[in-house]
Amino acid sequence: MISSKLNNNYYNNPFTFNNNSNTISVTQKEALKKTIKEAAVLTDIALVNLNNDGPSLEISALIESKCKQLYEYSTTNTITIYNLLNYNNNNNYNNINRYNNNNSPSNNNNNNNNNNNNNNNNNNNNNSNNNNNNNNINNNNNSNNNNINNNNNNNSENNCNNNFNVNKNLDNDKYNNKSCKNNNINNNNNNNNNSENKEKNNINNNNEKENNEYNNNRSASTSPVIKRSKSLSPILQFDKIDLEEEYTSDYDYSDGSNESSSPTLSASTLSSEDSKPKVLKRGRGRPSKPKPVQCFSCFRSNTPEWRKGKDKDGNVIDLCNACGLSYMKYIKKAKESKDKLSINNLINK
């Protein structure tokens, strides 16, 4: 227990210093280190157990006793606490709590003569500025608001800024919160105000909207959600093809007079939207050379290349360079079946 340790005469006996010398014994230096460490431990206990009624009388008395000793040591000698205490205690006891004549922790930063310990949370330096007319030992973080700011997750995208006010309820576990995202405890109440996500990924809770509108963080120019039509193929919508209709082609397969041209579908077979060649970007965004039509058999991700070939009768025809199926042969099979499901079966083969 902290109280049992303080009952030892080792802590209660006053330390003697040589006012005319800047040197002290090793024993006195180590004793002063332990006294400061005890005061820091009591400060941590007071912060954890702080409530609306204030800390317990026992804790208040212990803090008062330790802070009085520290004040006397720092003002009656030319040696400052910073010169005596030059150590880093693993970030555990680097803060000395406030003390004033009211025998309780105070948040008063308006006194003209303050003895400030400005503790930098990043490098844990103990800086002490001594004034002879001061009755306060102030722990001032961030210089103005008396908040202890712990910045965790410095290597992640989101830094945690947890501001704790010593006037309200504190939870010591929150000092080590490594997964927070801008959770600030308000200085005036106990409400947890969650700030807006800087990545602007707040999605509107209205799940009935199919386009998933973003709430207050997405601009009105966001492209709408594209609804895919329910077709047998993601490339061509076969439900738009009338297989009963007579097939016509601008390409003449009877002779080789139009060998330079490529097979095309008439407007009566496919809609104008589906008859457009699919141009996909490859590499650094350079579009592939558009082809007149895709192969209905293999459905490659990009437009297949066509090569010239001959059928059994010796006629020059266009063949898919990927699967080798004739364009006209496929259409002929689809027409003869007069069944849309047969098209799907041919695709799956």
UniProtKB/Swiss-Prot annotation:
UniProt lists compositionally biased (Low complexity) regions at 95-169, 177-195, 257-272
Q: Composition bias, kind Basic residues: at what positions?
A: 278-289
Using the record, list the residue span of the signal peptide; answer none if the entry has no such feature. none
- A Pfam family per the record: GATA
BP terms from Gene Ontology? negative regulation of transcription by RNA polymerase II; positive regulation of transcription by RNA polymerase II
Q: Where is the composition biased (Basic and acidic residues)?
A: 196-212
Q: Looking at the UniProt record for this protein, which Gene Ontology cellular component terms does it annotate, in alphabetical order?
A: nucleus
- Spell out the SUPFAM superfamilies in the cross-references: Glucocorticoid receptor-like (DNA-binding domain) (SSF57716)
Task: Identify the InterPro entries for this entry.
Answer: Znf_GATA, Znf_NHR/GATA
What is an example of a GO molecular function annotated in this UniProt entry? zinc ion binding
In residue numbers, the region (Disordered) covers: 95-227, 250-294
In which domain of life is the source organism classified?
Eukaryota
Q: Which UniProt keywords apply?
A: Metal-binding, Zinc, Zinc-finger
User: Zinc fingers (GATA-type) span which residues?
Assistant: 295-323
This one is known as: GATA zinc finger domain-containing protein 24
- Species assigned in the record: Dictyostelium discoideum (Social amoeba)
